[in-house]
Amino acid sequence: MTEAQKERILGHLKSDTELFTPVGISAVDRTAGYYLPNGYWNGNVWLSHQWFVWKTMLDLGETDFAYKIAETALNAWKREVEYSYYTFEMFSIETGRGGWFHNFGGLSAPINLWSAAYFTPGTYQSGFDTFCESAAFNDTYTAFCGRFTNAGAYDGALLVVMAENGSYSVTLNGASAVFTARFDGMLEITLPKGCKNAEIRIQLV
């Protein structure tokens, strides 16, 4: 994939008039002739396919968009469950409401994975191109050590959720790592492309 191709694809995914909607990424582009507001697969949002897009965003280091995908899905699911107490099959782009089968187990895995990836201490996540050699937290989730290989063509992202105790230091092979604290305890760490069996250490400071 060339850089121009990557940017063009990201542009379509992020566009509020094409694929991205208030309830998540549409199954089809809303500018397509076969998009129907009252359609089934061609007019709604499912969660499962978005998980694959989310993981790919971690491969590309697109952490802001990855979080937007997860946050949008979690909020859409939360609103519907609080209103109806149902876990519907999909969400209508036009109404924001859930629809079709009301106890759809296929919604459960992406929701649980996104919730854990950003809000559950003791959780780590990466993209498809990153291989975890080993990983361990201490009992209080204030320290972490892991070894990771990024086999992708881009600098990827490793998400690690620590305890909400304060600030953390992050090292990559003993040197200061590039990372962002999205919020207290939730760290987004850059894994440089080509790194092999790289040691990540996180410590409460």
Predicted regions and their residues:
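C-terminal capping/lid segments that line or modulate ligand- or cofactor-binding pockets
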Residues: 1-17, 39-141
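Generic long, charged, amphipathic alpha-helical segments
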Residues: 20-46
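Short, well-ordered beta-strand segments enriched in hydrophobic/aromatic residues
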Residues: 142-150
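Short, isolated positions in well-ordered beta-strands
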Residues: 143, 177-178
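Surface-exposed beta-strand/loop patches in extracellular or lumenal glycoproteins
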Residues: 149-166
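A short tyrosine-centered beta-strand micro-motif
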Residues: 168-170, 196
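Short strand-turn-strand beta-turns centered on an Asx-Gly dipeptide
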Residues: 171-175
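C-terminal beta-strand-rich structural cap/linker in extracellular carbohydrate-active enzymes
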Residues: 181-205
